[in-house]
């Protein structure tokens, strides 16, 4: 084996552990690297907050990539045009709506969030939250494959002033509190894009002290309808949760 093989390994290990060590105490831990989570990460990081996103899958981006039924295009409301210009995502305006290539959109959000300073930990699952004095104060993390395989391996804890559940339809983080009777959780209702886009933004916010909910998780928690491959509500929800947290941290 050449010394270069060892060098490659050492550089990866050193850089990753530096990144992890610097993320053990955060302003905001975002769970789920979908559209609302990445938008919130971008907005918070560009304003100087220490933000990390924990994504249990290998591929961040949530439900963006597949567009509608694997037709890799998505739709947004016209009001998102300024945001797309800000993050330099290309789009077309058709019939008073915005159409975007879903692969371009997902990769653009990922680039902007990480460029702004957010750290994305893919293949890392949040298996629990830390609660002290009646308030969520961090996340309990383990390797995604470890959790999926049910291996008996203890996790580690990351401290965070606020935690955002951006895990989409399952609302995984809120579910952890609901099964212990700490919060009430409803269920997602059938498709209604018009109502859902408004519902998800209106109901974005704190569900338990220190824990906020954004994106499709809002519909699962509060009993809102789903909306399919229109993503304006996801972006607006991510922006709203970032504003709420920013105001609380200042």
UniProtKB/Swiss-Prot annotation:
Gene Ontology biological process terms, A to Z: thiamine biosynthetic process; thiamine diphosphate biosynthetic process; thiazole biosynthetic process
A single MF term (Gene Ontology): pentosyltransferase activity
Keywords, comma-separated and alphabetical: Iron, Metal-binding, NAD, Thiamine biosynthesis, Transferase
Pathway: Cofactor biosynthesis; thiamine diphosphate biosynthesis
Superkingdom of origin: Bacteria
Cofactor: Fe(2+)
Enzyme Commission number: 2.4.2.59
UniProt key word Transferase: yes
UniProt catalytic activity: hydrogen sulfide + glycine + NAD(+) = ADP-5-ethyl-4-methylthiazole-2-carboxylate + nicotinamide + 3 H2O + H(+)
InterPro entries linked: FAD/NAD-bd_sf (IPR036188), Thi4_fam (IPR002922), Thi4_prok (IPR022828)
Positions annotated to bind NAD(+): 36, 55-56, 63, 126, 152-154, 216
Binding locations of Fe cation: 154, 169
UniProt enzyme class: transferase
Known role: Involved in the biosynthesis of the thiazole moiety of thiamine. Catalyzes the conversion of NAD and glycine to adenosine diphosphate 5-(2-hydroxyethyl)-4-methylthiazole-2-carboxylate (ADT), an adenylated thiazole intermediate, using free sulfide as a source of sulfur.
Family per record: Belongs to the THI4 family.
NCBIfam families tied to this protein: sulfide-dependent adenosine diphosphate thiazole synthase (TIGR00292)
Quaternary structure note: Homooctamer; tetramer of dimers.
Protein name, per record: Thiamine thiazole synthase
Organism of provenance: Thermotoga maritima (strain ATCC 43589 / DSM 3109 / JCM 10099 / NBRC 100826 / MSB8)
